[in-house]
Amino acid sequence: GTGVWGETTGTTQDSVGVYGSAPGSAWAGYFQGHLGTSGTLVKAAGSFRIDHPLDPLNKYLSHSFVESPDMMNLYSGTVTLDGEGNAIVQLPEWFEALNRDFRYQLTCIGESAPVYIAREIVNNRFAIAGGHGSMKVSWQVIGTRRDPYAIANPIPIESWKGTRERGRLLHPEAYGQTKSANNLTERERRSQNVHRTR
């Protein structure tokens, strides 16, 4: 069943189904378990935090997300070249259905050679050439999403703030401002939306 149900009848970017706030490093919301969304996640920063592999009882280990102005996917691997210094890298069958605008990186391992992309991605595979027999090459391919959701919902790199947000800051403390300079106060959030719980 559903523990909490939030819904708004508003249709603008100022409309919020569920709103929570917390001061300082406190959590405005915390989920013990999986978290899913069928829409777009918007955030100021992101990371993972796990029990530290070398000291799991006493420490955490955190890494930040890698961000991009594009909806990018990153794929990488290592391939061993054949006797003529060539290799074919096979990608998943859905690769070209999901990605476009490919970018490539190649790095030789253990020795140097003028390796290059001999054939770009066609039928979900690409070719490497210019190396030595049995040489290992690390490869990386980056693609931009071209699936229907990504095409229909591009993320604007720059955008104007909404009417209620104009002249205010998401993180006023970072700019040396008081919390009153925040985008919307909790009171305003409550007044503009109807919240329901079930």
Region spans (language model):
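Surface-exposed, glycine- and small/polar-enriched segments that build interaction surfaces at terminal
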Residues: 1-45
